[in-house]
């Protein structure tokens, strides 16, 4: 039975006339567009070279045929049909089979390599008739046109070309097909399109970008307008995977995940006690501190505890190799290789610079969907933050934490700070508000010797120890000791010894402020 390709997105206001939308089945796009693109209208997809415009159009047609049995016509003004078919195969889209089945027709309007002379006034009448004939013959519901910029480049009379393309879009709208038309733009944040195409194809405009941010390129998609209907505003990151375009609709995420009162162990008994019995099952934990403070050790204990209980776990490592991680863990009595052999642990080591943040996010989501772990660890977030903007990094963290919570997974992430001693920002990009629990590790100098300190800086929904405790690292792992009772100013990096007499004096001052006498306290 044929599936409905119409959007199920509805508005609550009964007085408004709703614009019917058609689903694209492009991952994430139907979320940010509130149900797809308007039925029977033309949508302009604009972007610089290499941003994914042609792929968007082909993916729209392919999914329409495969999922909804909507025949389609694709008009190409640039690439040859042979190249289009071959390129689509790399994504598993067998366009030739669809053509053989009579579901797809590719109309070749690409320029003649030998060139051509125009006698008389230029018009697209013959092409418009060919397109209309193909639509009628194949009973097409969807049309893709790639790209109208090529027409302007072939002919000098831009005003005449604009007029003819307006005729084409008007005819397509009259026929009632839903069209995706691509065009090029000069700059990522300049005019919407070259030659003023958006002036006559103005019902719907989508902009795709491939911007160099810092040291890496970042792909984003923005719906500039969908006339007569709602959509989400702003740019949304996307990547191109083996399955095509994959948009991450971070703004479409809803805080509707369930919250569990169940607890999971950190793998360190004293730390569990400091956290009121362990971490909440579906919480996100961030451990932050300078290099060498023991962050990866806590990650190892966290993963070991999961595997001891027969649960699966994934470690996404961006700073150390698998061999180095396994060696270090083994020195603390943790056998990562044995856990992997049992199928309980999966370690993925990647250089942060090997891909963009969107690609890393897609890999994390894919691995979670395939392996189905109950716990994940990322070591470290700060490595992924190198060379990218704060906004891009924050969106990445939101994507990871949102997906982990959706899947009810406990996440344990590390962050390396630049300061060895003293107070510091937990994270420069302010991601601390996204996490549920924050563990702060730091170095402290006490009586001329270097020590380590740990404290539970924050824990949502639970009592936790407020003390700053000393801890050391032995061959058995972390050993958390008592709090630094006789010192103050540890977090600021200037610990000062407080004598018992001074502590009594401070206590009396507090009592006087509260209006209490010694007799009242007895």
Swiss-Prot record:
Residues 1-248, 262-522 form the KaiC domain. ATP 1 binds at residues 50-54, 90, 225-227, 229, 231, 241-242. InterPro entries: Circadian_clock_KaiC-rel, Circadian_KaiC_bact, KaiC, KaiC-like_dom, KaiC_C, KaiC_dom, KaiC_N, P-loop_NTPase. Its cofactor is Mg(2+). GO terms for biological process: circadian rhythm; regulation of circadian rhythm; regulation of DNA-templated transcription. Phosphorylated on serine and threonine residues by autocatalysis. Has a 4 step phosphorylation cycle; the autokinase acts first on Thr-433, then Ser-432. When Ser-432 is modified KaiC switches to an autophosphatase mode, acting first on phospho-Thr-433 then phospho-Ser-432. Mg(2+) 2 binds at residues 296, 319. Mg(2+) 1 binds at residue 54. Keywords: ATP-binding, Biological rhythms, Hydrolase, Kinase, Magnesium, Metal-binding, Nucleotide-binding, Phosphoprotein, Repeat, Serine/threonine-protein kinase, Transcription, Transcription regulation, Transferase. The modification Phosphothreonine is found at residue 433. It catalyses: L-seryl-[protein] + ATP = O-phospho-L-seryl-[protein] + ADP + H(+); L-threonyl-[protein] + ATP = O-phospho-L-threonyl-[protein] + ADP + H(+); ATP + H2O = ADP + phosphate + H(+). Binds 2 Mg(2+) ions per subunit, one in each domain. Mg(2+) is required for hexamerization and phosphatase activity. ATP 2 binds at residues 291-297, 332, 452, 458-460, 462, 464, 466. GO terms for molecular function: ATP binding; ATP hydrolysis activity; DNA binding; magnesium ion binding; protein serine kinase activity; protein serine/threonine kinase activity; protein serine/threonine/tyrosine kinase activity. Its EC number is 2.7.11.1, 3.6.4.-. Central component of the KaiABC oscillator complex, which constitutes the main circadian regulator in cyanobacteria. Complex composition changes during the circadian cycle to control KaiC phosphorylation. KaiA stimulates KaiC autophosphorylation, while KaiB sequesters KaiA, leading to KaiC autodephosphorylation. Clock output pathways impact the RpaA transcriptional regulator. KaiC enhances the autophosphorylation activity of SasA, which then transfers its phosphate group to RpaA to activate it. KaiB and KaiC together enhance the phospho-RpaA dephosphatase activity of CikA. Homohexamer; hexamerization is dependent on ATP-binding. The KaiABC complex composition changes during the circadian cycle to control KaiC phosphorylation. Complexes KaiC(6), KaiA(2-4):KaiC(6), KaiB(6):KaiC(6) and KaiC(6):KaiB(6):KaiA(12) are among the most important forms, many form cooperatively. KaiC interacts with SasA, activating its autokinase function and leading to RpaA activation. Belongs to the KaiC family. This is Circadian clock oscillator protein KaiC. It comes from Acaryochloris marina (strain MBIC 11017). The lineage of its organism: Bacteria, Bacillati, Cyanobacteriota, Cyanophyceae, Acaryochloridales.
